[in-house]
């Protein structure tokens, strides 16, 4: 079991309490590779479970790229455990996310969600897992965002509350997802 101490929040991370990561991929092998490589640079990746939902091709034109993505994701390492879910028919992004997030968050109680075109910071998993722990009992916090629209940050802390949902790297809990 690995442990990491963050003196600011005094949070102990262990491989037993890290949120699972769910990555949704389709037909962009280069983007998918960049997303995974960025995640692998996170210290907490090795202790995290990664679930990859690979949607099926919409049509014949997409089949080659979908197959390239599927070949690549089978070669991934650097995580505690990797589970690949290959859709046999095309679900579309929205349906795939709803289904995948619902299944995983109901099983684990919390979740980190990414799509195949995001490049995260080496501290992304640390930030998300710490925020999930800090705000788990704060029912007014429905999700944690890893990205924000460009705003004037003068007077704001590194972490602040925002009334909008951002879908470019986010996390939530099972009880909030049910709403």
Label each region the model flagged.
Residues 1-17:
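Short, basic, low-complexity termini and linkers enriched in Ser/Thr/Gly/Pro
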């Amino acid at each position: 079991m690995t442990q990491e101490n963050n003196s600011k929040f005094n949070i102990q991370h262990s491989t037993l309490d890290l949120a699972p990561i769910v990555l949704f991929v389709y037909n962009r092998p280069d983007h998918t590779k960049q997303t995974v490589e960025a995640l692998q640079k996170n210290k907490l990746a090795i202790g995290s479970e990664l679930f990859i939902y690979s949607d099926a091709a919409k049509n014949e034109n997409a089949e080659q790229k979908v197959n390239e993505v599927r070949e690549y994701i089978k070669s991934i390492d650097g995580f505690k455990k990797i589970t690949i879910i290959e859709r046999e028919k095309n679900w579309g992004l929205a349906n795939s996310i709803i289904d995948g997030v619902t299944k995983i968050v109901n099983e684990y109680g919390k979740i980190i969600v990414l799509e195949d075109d995001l490049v995260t910071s080496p501290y992304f998993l640390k930030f998300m897992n710490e925020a999930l722990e800090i705000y788990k009992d704060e029912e007014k916090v429905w999700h944690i965002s890893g990205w924000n629209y460009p705003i004037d940050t003068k007077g704001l802390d590194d972490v602040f509350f925002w009334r909008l949902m951002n879908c470019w790297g986010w996390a939530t809990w099972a009880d909030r997802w049910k709403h």
